[in-house]
A protein has these predicted regions:
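Basic, Lys/Arg-enriched alpha-helical interface segments
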Residues: 1-71, 81-83, 91-119
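ATP-dependent carboxylate-activation loops
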Residues: 87
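Short, surface-exposed beta-strand/loop micro-motifs that present aromatic residues
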Residues: 74-77
Length: 119
């Protein structure tokens, strides 16, 4: 079984965790559906890792993967000791994952590596 961690920036913000909490506080049906689907996909990632394959996870480039619940995308990276770090999220509106979202995930991952090396 794999572990899932949430990326936290230097200011203490956790973008993916905050998004999930936002969905939890939503009172509409769409929020509940999204939240349940994200939780289901996170459970699959915990159980099967990247071997779950499509439609659950997809490799994008380098160390960046995407979790694919509905139109939501959660970009993550493989982390230490068979774990994953959820970096960022967005709602997919085009056929192809936007390059700027992949670059953002790479920046966050590089930041995480740099800050963890300082410890």
């Amino acid at each position: 079984m794999y572990q899932i961690h949430f990326y936290q920036d230097a200011a203490g913000h956790q973008p993916v965790k905050e998004y999930i909490q936002e969905l939890q506080s939503g009172n509409n049906k769409d929020s509940r559906i999204k939240l349940n689907k994200i939780r289901d996909y996170m459970r699959i990632l915990e159980l099967k890792g990247t071997r779950a394959g499509e439609p659950f996870v997809k490799h994008l480039e380098d160390n960046i993967w995407e979790l694919r619940p509905l139109r939501d995308r959660i970009l993550f990276a493989v982390w230490i000791n068979e774990s994953f770090i959820l970096l960022t999220h967005f709602v997919k509106k085009t056929q192809k994952t936007p390059k700027r979202e992949i670059e953002k995930a790479k920046r966050l991952y590089a930041d995480l590596l740099e800050r963890s090396a300082e410890k």
